[in-house]
UniProtKB/Swiss-Prot annotation:
Record's keyword terms, sorted: Acetylation, Cell membrane, Cytoplasm, Lipid metabolism, Membrane, NADP, Oxidoreductase, Phosphoprotein
Main subcellular localisation: cytoplasm
One GO-annotated biological process of the protein: aldehyde catabolic process
Identification of the protein by name: Aldo-keto reductase family 1 member A1
Tree of life domain: Eukaryota
């Protein structure tokens, strides 16, 4: 069953459910991608920093293309430019590395992963002596211009942003000749992102939700944090509709026309996550789920400095999460 799609301003159809691959280990991700394709997924979300693009590429080579299970034009593949590759000279080589790893001739969507740049080079997390990150002064507007050249060369069909706030999106729009088509951010009922979604939709951007299930498998999880999949409203709806809590969270998003990229390597869950197009919540039920919002952000990159866990980039002038949205 092919997932329903949203139409990007480029004319591309982007499936509302994709397979997320963050934290999918090499050794497991190839089988997950092959299984997802076999049950109807047509959207795979990747990133250079996830360290598993070569293995995803093996799956794509086996199953995608002329005479194979999935025609290339039916598949939507996203990847992301890492923070160490923001310098305009580094953008095309970074993309070409991703294309080589994924064994593709073009990407459907290429995102700037974060608004700020790290020091150039091959160390993905360059550090100062005190353990803090070494940043680079390249501004995202310069990076954007280099990304636009990739579209002109036919290497990328659409561009987008990840982890940008509303002000930064408008900043990009002020210089863009190729307008961003998608914003990818953390989003789930605890972090509903209503203002940011409205901001994007008013400007012709679609929104992709990462960690749509609340990302309880993160290494730095706080034992006291709320668990979205155990929320009583979610459990009650799961019982009513005979669905899993995960399916309830995903249905809420697709009913708002928000794209979701739940990560799984478990076949039963991969299958479950795409089966969210055959039931519909009432307006009242949508309201109940909307009411869970507490602006709770699970994904804040952390560092240990002097034995304490601190937000890694919060002091950077381009850090996106200091603004209201």
């Amino acid at each position: 069953m092919a997932a329903s799609c949203v139409l990007l301003h480029t004319g591309q159809k982007m499936p509302l459910i994709g397979l997320g691959t963050w934290k999918s280990e090499p050794g497991q991700v190839k089988a997950a991608v092959k299984y997802a394709l076999s049950v109807g997924y047509r959207h795979i979300d990747c990133a250079a920093i996830y360290g598993n693009e070569p293995e995803i590429g093996e799956a794509l080579k086996e199953d995608v293309g002329p005479g194979k299970a999935v025609p290339r034009e039916e598949l939507f593949v996203t990847s992301k430019l890492w923070n160490t590759k923001h310098h305009p000279e580094d953008v095309e080589p970074a993309l070409r590395k991703t294309l080589a790893d994924l064994q593709l001739e073009y990407l459907d969507l290429y995102l700037m992963h974060w608004p700020y740049a790290f020091e150039r080079g091959d160390n993905p997390f360059p550090k100062n002596a005190d353990g803090t990150i070494c940043y680079d002064s390249t501004h995202y507007k310069e990076t954007w211009k280099a990304l636009e050249a990739l579209v002109a060369k036919g290497l990328v069909q659409a561009l987008g942003l990840s982890n940008f706030n509303s002000r930064q999106i408008d900043d990009i729009l002020s210089v863009a000749s190729v307008r961003p088509a998608v914003l990818q951010v953390e989003c789930h009922p605890y972090l509903a992102q209503n203002e940011l979604i409205a901001h994007c939709q008013a400007r012709g951007l679609e929104v992709t939700a990462y960690s749509p299930l609340g990302s309880s498998d993160r290494a730095w999880r706080d034992p006291d944090e709320p668990v979205l999949l155990e929320e009583p409203v979610v459990l009650a709806l799961a019982e009513k509709y005979g669905r899993s809590p995960a399916q309830i969270l995903l249905r809420w998003q697709v009913q708002r026309k928000v794209i979701c990229i739940p990560k799984s390597i478990t076949p039963s869950r991969i299958l479950q996550n795409i089966k969210v197009f055959d039931f519909t919540f009432s307006p009242e039920e949508m309201k109940q789920l909307n009411a869970l919002n507490k602006n709770w952000r699970y994904i804040v990159p952390m560092l240990t400095v002097d034995g304490k866990r601190v937000p890694r980039d919060a002091g950077h002038p381009l850090y996106p999460f200091n603004d209201p949205y």
